[in-house]
Regions:
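Active-site-proximal beta-strand elements of phosphoester/diester hydrolases
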Residues: 3-13, 17, 94, 137-145, ...
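Cys-nucleophile CN-hydrolase/nitrilase-fold catalytic domain and related Cys-dependent amidase chemistry
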Residues: 19, 26-105, 170-183, 190
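CN hydrolase (nitrilase-like) catalytic-core segments centered on the catalytic cysteine
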Residues: 63-78, 147-230
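Catalytic metal-binding/acid-base residues of hydrolase active sites
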Residues: 12, 45, 84-85, 112, ...
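Short, basic/aromatic-enriched C-terminal tail that caps enzymatic domains
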Residues: 232-260
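Short, acidic/polar
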Residues: 20-29, 147-153
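Active-site catalytic loop in hydrolytic enzyme cores
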Residues: 86-158, 172-179, 244-249, 259
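Short beta-strand scaffold segments in enzyme catalytic cores
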Residues: 81-83, 94-97, 129, 211-213, ...
């Protein structure tokens, strides 16, 4: 089994300007100085967290999906983040998971943020996504999903190794973001990555970043704090396997069945 090099981008976003965001993010990704396996972008990285889906949504054949395919091929890495997608007359806050060969899978955000009225605009997802990538099993989720531990619960029969969240999580609730991200790593005996944005959106919401990568013990491997930038770290396969072999909490949990 191999190690996994993970890169994530913490950045401000241009409000409702997908072309500007793709261009700015593309420039930042071009600064990668080492090979990486996985590149993670924030939630709604083309628009900011918006309820104006009719004017901002793209289709799966639109420019953002094409751009993700270009970036994945250029960096020989999976590139992921969420965007506003229209499909069959419905709108989704859709995490797009794009491999270097152009193949694509996706996860639609399950828990919609009722405080912002997200449920009135978007359709919730019905299933989790767990992807096998270069020897690691990865479960990508979106923002508000972080507050619901049953949805991220690891399965001892086929555990994921890395749990990741892409987010537009406001600074006013940053304590919850940091606390829950750490809890998700510890309770699932898995590495955890949370990728948030910084700056202020057009609605006046401030974002403090606090993107972080943690190991399965809940120890910080990378903390971005409020800094803009592209962060890279290599997760060690043997460290995760050794810890799980010694600390078998996944096998001691209660049996359950998850239904969407």
């Amino acid at each position: 089994m191999s190690d996994l090099t993970v890169s994530f981008l913490q950045t401000a976003l241009h409000w409702h300007d997908a072309a500007a965001n793709r261009a700015a993010i593309g420039q930042q990704l071009a600064s990668l100085k080492q090979p990486t396996d996985l590149i993670v972008l924030p939630e709604m990285f083309t628009t900011g967290f918006s309820m104006e889906a009719p004017g901002q949504a793209e289709t799966m054949s639109g420019p953002t999906v094409a751009w993700l395919r270009e970036q994945a091929a250029a960096h020989n890495a999976v590139v992921t983040g969420s965007a506003i997608i229209e499909e069959n007359g419905s709108y989704f806050n859709r995490l797009l998971w794009v491999r270097p060969d152009g193949s694509l899978r996706y996860y639609d955000k399950r828990h919609l943020f009722t405080l912002a009225g997200e449920q009135h605009t978007y359709t919730p997802g019905q299933a989790r996504l767990v992807e096998d990538w270069r020897g690691w099993r990865i479960c990508p989720l979106v923002c508000y999903d972080l507050r619901f531990p049953v949805w991220s619960r690891n399965q001892p029969a086929a555990p994921y190794d890395l749990l990741l969240y892409v987010a537009n999580w406001p600074a006013v609730r940053r304590t919850a973001w940091m606390t829950l991200l750490r809890a998700r790593a510890i309770e699932n005996v898995a590495c955890a990555l949370g990728v948030n944005r910084i700056g202020q959106d057009a609605l006046g919401h401030d974002y403090s970043g606090d993107s972080a990568l943690l190991d399965a013990k809940g120890s910080y491997l990378v903390e971005a704090h409020a800094e803009a930038g592209l962060f890279t770290h290599t997760l060690k396969r043997d460290e995760l396997d050794d810890f799980r072999a010694r600390f078998t909490a996944l096998n001691d949990g209660d049996a359950f069945e998850l239904r969407a």
